[in-house]
From Swiss-Prot:
Keywords: ATP-binding, Chaperone, Nucleotide-binding. Pfam families: HSP70. The gene is hscA. It comes from Methylibium petroleiphilum (strain ATCC BAA-1232 / LMG 22953 / PM1). GO terms for molecular function: ATP binding; ATP hydrolysis activity; ATP-dependent protein folding chaperone; unfolded protein binding. Belongs to the heat shock protein 70 family. This is Chaperone protein HscA homolog.
Amino acid sequence: MALLQISEPGQSPDPHQRRIAVGIDLGTTHSLVAAVRSGVAECLPDDEGRVILPSAVRYLEGGRRAIGFDALAAQAEDPENTIVSAKRFMGRTLTDIDDREKLPYRFVDQPGMVSVATRDGVKTPVEVSAELLATLRFRAEDSFDDELFGAVITVPAYFDDAQRQATKDAAQLAGLNVLRLINEPTAAAIAYGLENGSEGLYAVYDLGGGTFDISLLRLSEGVFEVVATGGDSALGGDDYDHALADWALAGAGLAAETAQDKRAVLVAARAVKEALSSAAEARMQVVLRAGLLDLAVTRVQFEALTKPLTDRTLAAVRKVLRDAKVSKDEVKGVVLVGGSTRMPQIREAVTLYLGRSPLTDLNPDEVVALGAAIQAHQLAGNASGNDLLLLDVTPLSLGLETMGGLVERIIPRNSSIPTARAQDFTTFKDGQTAMAIHVLQGEREQVEYCRSLARFELRGIPPMVAGAARIRVSFQVDADGLLSVTAREQTSGVEAAVTVKPSYGLADEQIARMLQEGFTTAEGDMRDRALREARVETERMVLATRAALAADGDLLADGERAGIEALMRAAEQQALGEDAAAIDAAVKALADGTESFAAERMNRGIRQALAGRRVEEV
């Protein structure tokens, strides 16, 4: 199948000049780096032949670091200084981390992002991630014996702007040139699309160590389009470990009293979870300060106690299908991504719900890195004639505030990115020289129920009558999901802009709540919107009529003026009520009642414009 070729700005025009570009899966539990070598994407191993790098960093005395397997080996004995799953903290504040009491770290709530106190000082998730990225960068450079041109780094589909920017910052600290951030499910689709050449509608079910993503993708004629996305940025294999650990401690009547105990129980729980993927029973043994934890765990027990977690993933699948307005029968195949999908209960639940066995052709641990490597190979200009078009989507609608506290959507939810859209707005009052721009994210019709992203002002608008100025507001979302908003007054050219980089992340429960409320309150929201719009139109009409009376009231007889003023009062009184139709009727009555007055004003304006001018000048 011939795929559409896309050339990126700055791409080398020389087809023989090969640049070393890699794909990096910066995962919660482990990370990988892959590259295309001799036309085949492959994960790059370390000196001992291991392709997986545990996402763990241990901080030692004197500024030394232990990274990956070395850090993981000391996790139980030195949990406070061994940071794992740092990806879960990217772009987050302390209040965003619901399970912090279960974690052994000494959290520090610094402005902008939570940090962890270690023996080597306070470390941010960005710094921890940078250590992992630098290790993978050195591995790739050693493998090719050359410097890297750049990297495509994957992120969960539900990472918001703050989390994506934090990932870019970590890459910069690691000395990496980021060619693009792409969603993990999309990277998996790239790998499977190229390997199998299959077209159709696919569900990508990605359950990693700390995040869950479900995406619906349409593969057709070389185009990967993400139709809809969903998920939970704080649900993954780690939560299965915590559930098993809590259950085991409660059953034994013991408590994890120290950080070492907490970490040791979690390590043992993970080992049991992995063993139960191939065995019907496994033994959990941990020496704690309070005593010996020793019990047998069956697969049936484990699946029963973690069923609520599995059900949460299926609820997200249902939501994505509803968003895309497709039935389960239309899904051609299911792609499993993430090591946690090796659990038999996951494969059984997905098969039962979607009615088809998932694709498992590629290693679920490696598939994301392989797809990222293929994309990096193309963006570096190394691929010849077989590039593909990649379309990600915005997870929530983007818009701005208008009069009456209403939200005007500019970019709807699930719009393919990169994208740019613009809309014209105007002034509300005569002589208005500034306009406040309030950028919002969410699915509700009212400002108070949406998330505020940014505020800025456009100043220097030429004074005009209300409605005469034309302000074009442009929204642009780049390939990394970052938003830029520009407001420009068309006649004067004055302009203001903002790039949205929120200082904190959007918690997973907030995302779920915003989407659910947008769905369940849609009918009521539309009624409220109609009422607010009617009130805004009343205010606009009354203001315009008052201004007209002040300027040209001498055109009216006393009785005519009194009639118009009575209609104005009636409209204002009606606007205090809750009946949008009645308000609209009052505004229409005011418009009808001022129609002859408007005609007289127009005639006066024409006479004034033509006064003293000859026919040939007109």
